Amino acid sequence: MRVIFMGTPLFAVPSLRAVAEADNDVEIVLVVTGKDKPRRSQRAEPEPTPVKKAAKELGLAVLEIDDVKDARFADTIARYRPDVIVVAAFRILPPAVYELARLGSFNLHASLLPRYRGAAPVNWTIINGDRETGVTTFFLGRKVDTGNIILQQRTPVAPEETAGELTERLADIGAGVVLKTLKRIRDGEAEPTIQDDAMATRAPKLTSETTRIDWAEPVDAICDFVRGLSPKPSAWTVFNHRKVKIYRVAPGMFQLPEQDEQQKVPGALVVDGTRMFVMALDGWVEILSLQMEGKRKMGAADFCCGFRCEEECPSFS
């Protein structure tokens, strides 16, 4: 079975390796990925995508592409005569490309579709406090993330798991599901299930506006929000007119002295020795790891050692 694999980030690498190293009649005839990224230093070589790095290590042919809608791209894919196209964290393919696969093209998605259709399923899973998630393989169709489901595998979300940690785990789970999906397609045993649109939820692309912390939310919601955005793109707030990225937090056990009760407003910041707490709607959030604009990432203790504030009642906003 001739397979073309398409993917770019680290999430796709376990699936690529699993298919390439599988002991069956599957052959990866081409790997398609994004273009190399320029580095900060003009003298340095451009940075290849994680998928390109892995493909080169595996001795596979690689095609870098910018525009998947370019007719020349479809012509190139056609020359490789794919039986199946496997997609993992890549672009939105036009029908002119995915319909070239003799047995079909399928995508690996990091959620239990139809829940969390969109660009950021792992982030929104944690932000919304879900305690279970999984991966889905589905045949590509004309609308994004709506194709018929081939296989799914569920997994619990750990209470303190970050988006980065969950993404890595789902990538490994997904690799096994991709192999099972290929086997079913090869053996003619794929029995696709139509998605129930009434059960669909969205996982839109994250923006600067949607990643800002609202300290008027409950403690648990803020903790989920920060976990769901860590390490990238990261939740953020403002302190002393400067942007602060927040990477790790926890529900805080702290009691203000009676004379300081007026500080109990959302966003109020209290530094207690080497620990720092921020007031939320229903309690305190302890900040464990953060990064001031223009500074390195640091633990709360390092921040507290150099703590300076121009305000009488410091706060995050």
Swiss-Prot record:
Transferase recorded as keyword: yes
Source domain of life: Bacteria
Any one GO MF annotation of this record: methionyl-tRNA formyltransferase activity
Pfam families to which the protein is assigned, alphabetical: Formyl_trans_C, Formyl_trans_N
Chain sites annotated for binding (6S)-5,6,7,8-tetrahydrofolate: S111, L112, L113, P114
Cellular component per GO, a single term: cytosol
Magnesium as UniProt keyword: no
UniProtKB keywords: Protein biosynthesis, Transferase
Reactions the enzyme catalyzes: L-methionyl-tRNA(fMet) + (6R)-10-formyltetrahydrofolate = N-formyl-L-methionyl-tRNA(fMet) + (6S)-5,6,7,8-tetrahydrofolate + H(+)
Principal EC category: transferase
Cleavable signal peptide: none
CDD domains the UniProt entry points to: FMT_core_Met-tRNA-FMT_N, Met_tRNA_FMT_C
NCBIfam families: fmt
Primary role: Attaches a formyl group to the free amino group of methionyl-tRNA(fMet). The formyl group appears to play a dual role in the initiator identity of N-formylmethionyl-tRNA by promoting its recognition by IF2 and preventing the misappropriation of this tRNA by the elongation apparatus.
HAMAP family, per the entry: Formyl_trans
Protein family per UniProt: Belongs to the Fmt family.
Protein's recorded name: Methionyl-tRNA formyltransferase
Species annotation: Chlorobium phaeobacteroides (strain BS1)
